[in-house]
Every structure is written in C-alpha cells, then in structure tokens.
C-alpha cells in the first residue's frame, strides 16, 4: 500500500506481486559450436611471443582508464590497483574501513567470455575460481569470502542462448557450493542484441558474447596476511598447482596459435587443496609475494612481477 498526502495511490496484493505472473514454458537446445580453424604455430622466439601477449588488448595495462576515477576509495586503500615501481595491476585491491581495526576488505573479479561459446558451464566455473583465487592469493580468509554475479547476455528467447544461460547458472550453483561462497547480490543485463541494417540495406543482427562477470569480496583478518606482487631480492619463486593441455580459446591460442587442445576445466577439489595450503603458508608468514596465474599463463604472471618490482627473474620450468 502506497499513500501520498494521506491519499492511497497504490494497493497491490503481495501474493499477486510475487506469484501472479504465470510461469513460462521455455525450450532450450544445444548450440552449434563453430569449430575454430586450427592455427599454425608460428616459429618465433619466446621473447617475441611474450611481447605479443603483453600487447594484446585483454592483457595490456589499463592504467589510463583506472586513474580517471576514484580508484583509491576515499583514502582507505591499503592495497591499490597499481602496485610496485612499475605500476602493474595486482590480483585484488584492499581497503581498511576502520582505522583502529586490523581487519581489511579485499575485492577482486573475473570474466572469461571467450569460453562461453565453447562451454558456458566451464566459463562460469573459471570465473568463480579466479575471483576466489585472487582473494586467497591476496591474503583473504577462505571462510569469509562472498561473490556476486553480473550476467550480460544476448537474447534468451533463442533456445541455444537460453541453454548457455542455463549452463552458466548451473555452474554458479555448483561452484558456489563447492567453494562455500554465497552469492550475496547480482544483476542481469539481458537481450543485448542489435538489429538493424548495413550500408547496403541488408538486415543484420549483432549480439554480445554470453558474458558472466563474477566479483568477489573477502575479509583479511590481519594486515600482515596481505600479499604484494613485488618480490624482493633473493626470493624463491614457486608455481603451485598443475598445468594441463587446456589452451583452447586462450589468449595464447588466439594470437600465436595452438595444437589440438581443449578449454580450461576447474577441478574444485584440486584447486581448493592448493588454496588451503597457500593460505596456511601465508598465515605462517612465509609468503612474501604472490600472484594468481590468469590470462597469458605463467609467462605473463612472472613478467608482471618482474615489471612491478623492476627486478629480473631466473626461471626454470623443468
């Protein structure tokens, strides 16, 4: 019931508001997956490949964008978006809302629209895993992490697009349960499709790729648990976790080429075991710096650490 100047202007039954709209009967169909033509791996040096990866739009620095708004959150930032002398984006940011409290709040996010057409379930799984991992790597307590979803989708009236949406939502449930991270909020932006005409008058339709952005927020119990991406002289660099033949739809495969591969699949049990061990080591104070491996793989991750700290690294992957 809504009144204005004591005059009733709206009286809507709550049962009707929540239950009055009839349920829709919608159909889904498995989408036709366009097989990407196999790219021939070009013979080039590791340096050339690294330069191509670093200059790709999804990896190159976005500093010119971030610094245009209040990216330091009213002077409460303790881990800022850009880290080190080289000013490189880290995995997460952290703010300290209360001056006299050791706790801080870490925030991160992840999105992998490039995987959506191949496997929307795994796309959502990768997004949740990365958003979660970024907070763990930054020092957050694994038992105090929550996530938010932001679905940016094309027309769900189309059975194949609705199927992709259903698969992504299913993954949200499965991985939120596996990681014990509740969805505390979210938003949907549907029907992002353009219908019009080209310069010849022919009708065209352009749809955005199915996209799911996962944001994560977590509590860091002590400031001493916060990590940085800038190693110090003499630090030993270790790689945690396993690498599998999962280069399909990766930045590397798009730019440089690939042999037969598949898209990344998150094994939550293996991942959580790695994250728990990292968290234990960090609480013991033996982690000086850390970075989560993301777009571009190990090569980009260690390069970010080197640029941020302006130090050289000796790497052995044998």
Residue ranges of predicted features:
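Glycine/proline-enriched, intrinsically flexible loops and inter-domain linkers
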Residues: 1-318
């Amino acid at each position: 019931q809504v009144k204005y100047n004591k005059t009733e202007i709206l009286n809507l039954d709550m049962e009707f508001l929540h239950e009055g709209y009839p349920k829709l009967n919608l159909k889904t169909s498995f989408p036709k997956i366009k097989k990407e033509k196999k790219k021939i791996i070009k013979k080039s040096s590791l340096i050339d490949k690294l330069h191509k990866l670093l200059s790709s739009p999804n990896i190159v620095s976005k500093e010119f964008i971030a610094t245009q708004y209040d990216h330091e959150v009213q002077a409460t930032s303790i881990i800022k978006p850009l880290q080190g002398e080289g000013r490189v984006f880290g995995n997460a940011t952290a703010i300290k809302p209360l001056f006299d409290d050791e706790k801080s709040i870490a925030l991160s996010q992840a999105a992998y629209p490039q995987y959506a057409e191949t496997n929307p379930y795994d796309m959502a799984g990768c997004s949740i895993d990365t958003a979660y991992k970024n907070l763990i790597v930054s020092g957050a307590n694994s038992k105090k992490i929550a996530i938010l979803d932001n679905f940016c989708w094309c027309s769900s009236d189309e059975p194949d697009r609705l199927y992709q949406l259903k698969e992504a939502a299913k993954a949200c449930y499965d991985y939120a349960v596996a990681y014990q991270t509740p969805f505390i909020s979210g938003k949907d932006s549907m029907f992002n499709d353009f219908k019009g005409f080209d310069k010849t008058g022919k009708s065209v339709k352009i749809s955005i790729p199915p996209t799911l952005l996962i944001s994560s927020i977590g509590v860091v119990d002590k400031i001493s648990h916060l990590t940085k991406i800038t190693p110090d002289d003499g630090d030993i660099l270790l790689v945690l976790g396993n690498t599998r033949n999962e280069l399909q739809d990766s930045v590397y495969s798009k730019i440089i080429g690939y042999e037969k591969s598949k898209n990344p699949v998150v094994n939550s049990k293996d991942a959580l075991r790695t994250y728990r061990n990292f968290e234990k080591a960090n609480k013991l104070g033996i982690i000086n710096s850390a970075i989560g491996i993301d777009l571009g793989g190990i090569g980009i991750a260690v390069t970010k650490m080197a640029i941020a700290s302006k130090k050289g690294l000796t790497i052995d992957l044998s």
